[in-house]
Amino acid sequence: ARHFDAEYQCICKSGIGITVSWDPLIMPEIYDRLLPTDSTSNWDFSLYRPNVVVVNLFQNDTWLVNLPNHPEFIKRFGDKTPDEDFLINAYQQFIAGLRAHYPTASIICSLGSMDATKPGSLWPGYVQKAVANLKDENVYTHFMPYEESTAHPNVQQQQNMADSLIQFIETTIDW
């Protein structure tokens, strides 16, 4: 946002996913809320109309869908691991909801530099299929180059992702 001198609003929660999270709530449940844990609090989407929306979700899902004994896995999926169609549809529905809120925005569906983008990962393909299914020329995919690490991205890795996103926006979106 600083690079483009743009207004910035962020909706984020550590450990959150689209289909399952490390905590009880998933992003599709809290996105429309003013207060994440209050299901009766509704955000007024007319208050802010972004030109660009960047979505960086699915990293937490990549781990949790493989942990069948985790309480949140059991809560969301019972004893059955979600299949590719379920994951793609969940992502697609979330992005379709964003489009309904932001009908003119460019939406960038991204994955960060953690293991969701590791060579051989299926998750970029899930995002690509979901976006293709939307048939919306203003919804894009952009995947950050994988950076091997044993932890969350450090300052330099965050800068690398910012640089990658800046370049993508500058070359793809009529800003």
Regions found by a protein language model. Give the residues of each.
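Conserved SGNH/GDSL esterase-like catalytic core that processes O-acyl groups on lipids
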Residues: 1-80, 85, 106, 115-121, ...
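A structural motif corresponding to the C-terminal end of an alpha-helix
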Residues: 2-6, 94-106, 133-137
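Surface-exposed acidic, glycine-flexible loop patches that form ligand/cofactor-binding
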Residues: 40-48, 96-102, 172-175
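A cross-family glycoside hydrolase active-site/sugar-binding cleft signature
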Residues: 56, 110, 144
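Aromatic/hydrophobic pocket-lining residues that form the small-molecule binding cavity
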Residues: 87, 91, 158
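Generic structural signal for well-ordered alpha-helices
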Residues: 91-96, 127-128
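Short glycine-rich catalytic loops that host catalytic nucleophiles or stabilize transition states
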Residues: 142-148
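Histidine-centered active-site loop/cap adjacent to the catalytic His
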Residues: 150-175
